[in-house]
Regions:
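Polytopic transmembrane helical bundles with strong interfacial aromatic enrichment
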Residues: 2-253
C-alpha cells in the first residue's frame, strides 16, 4: 500500500483552510509571475526567431506556439475543473468548489484562442476558415460546455447549490475530452495526427519542439496564476463575513 508522507498530508490539510491558502498564495504569486515571464520570453524567442521555417508551410506554421498550447490547455483545464468539482461534490471542500468554477472562464478563453488561431491557420493551409470535422466540432462543444458551466453558476443564487450543479455538468462533459484527443485517429479529419505525443519519436524537429514545450509550460503557469487570483477573489467574496477576512482588512489599513 502506498503511504503518503505526513508532511504532504499536513500541507494539503492546511491548504484546505481558507486563511492559510490565501496567505500562502500571496507569498507564492511573485515567483509564479517571474517564472511565467521567463518561460514566455524564452518560448517566443525560440519559436519566432530561432526555429527554422517549415519546408512546407514556411513561417505560417509559427502560429502553433499559441494554437497548440491553447488547445492542450483547453483539455487540461477541463479535467482539472471536473476533478475539483468531484472533490467538492463528494467531500464538500469549499476551496475545491471555488477552483472548479474559477477554472471555467480561463478554460473558455483558452478554448476560444485555440479555435480562433486554428481558423487563422486553417485558411491558408486548407483554404477555409472552418470545417465541421470531428476535432473542430468537439472543440467547439468544449467551449459550449465551459460557457454552460459559467452560465449555470451565475443563474443559481445559492452558490453552494450552484457549485454542486456545476460539478455534475463538468463530470458529464468529461466524455468529450477523449473524443477531442482521439478524433484524428478515430475519424478522417483535416487535422494531422499527433506529432509531439508520439510514443516512439516526435515528428517535429527539436528546434521547433523545445520552444513549443516552453510555451506549453508557460501557459500552465499562466493558468495557475489566473486560477489562484480568481480563487482568492471568490474566497474573499464568500468569506467576507469571516473573522480572518475582517482581521486581514484591519491589518492592511
Amino acid at each position: 500500500m502506498f503511504l503518503v508522507p505526513d508532511v504532504v498530508v499536513l500541507f494539503f490539510h492546511r491548504m484546505a483552510s481558507p486563511p492559510h491558502f490565501y496567505a500562502f498564495t500571496e507569498r507564492l504569486m511573485p515567483w509564479l509571475v517571474a517564472i511565467f515571464v521567463l518561460l514566455t520570453a524564452a518560448g517566443l524567442y525560440g519559436g519566432l526567431y530561432l526555429a527554422p521555417a517549415d519546408y512546407q508551410q514556411g513561417d505560417s506554421y509559427r502560429i502553433i506556439y499559441i494554437h497548440v498550447p491553447s488547445a492542450w490547455m483547453s483539455l487540461f483545464i477541463y479535467v482539472v475543473m471536473a476533478i475539483a468539482g468531484a472533490i467538492g461534490l463528494i467531500w464538500r471542500i469549499k476551496l475545491a468548489e471555488i477552483v472548479a468554477i474559477s477554472s471555467a472562464p480561463i478554460g473558455a478563453s483558452f478554448t476560444f484562442i485555440a479555435l480562433f488561431t486554428g481558423s487563422l491557420w486553417g485558411k491558408p493551409m486548407w483554404g477555409t476558415w472552418w470545417v465541421w470535422d470531428a476535432r473542430l466540432t468537439s472543440e467547439l462543444i468544449l467551449l459550449f460546455l465551459y460557457l454552460g458551466v459559467i452560465g449555470l453558476y451565475g443563474a443559481i443564487d445559492d452558490k453552494r447549490v450552484a457549485s454542486k450543479a456545476v460539478a455534475i455538468l463538468a463530470l458529464v462533459g468529461v466524455v468529450n475530452i477523449p473524443v477531442i484527443h482521439y478524433s484524428v485517429e478515430w475519424w478522417n479529419t483535416l487535422h494531422q495526427g499527433p506529432t509531439v505525443t508520439k510514443i516512439d519519436k516526435p515528428s517535429i524537429h527539436v528546434s521547433m519542439l523545445i520552444p513549443l514545450l516552453l510555451m506549453a509550460l508557460s501557459f500552465k503557469f499562466y493558468y495557475l496564476i489566473a486560477l489562484l487570483q480568481r480563487t482568492r477573489l471568490e474566497l474573499l467574496r464568500r468569506e467576507r463575513n469571516s473573522q480572518w477576512v475582517k482581521t486581514m482588512v484591519l491589518e492592511n489599513k
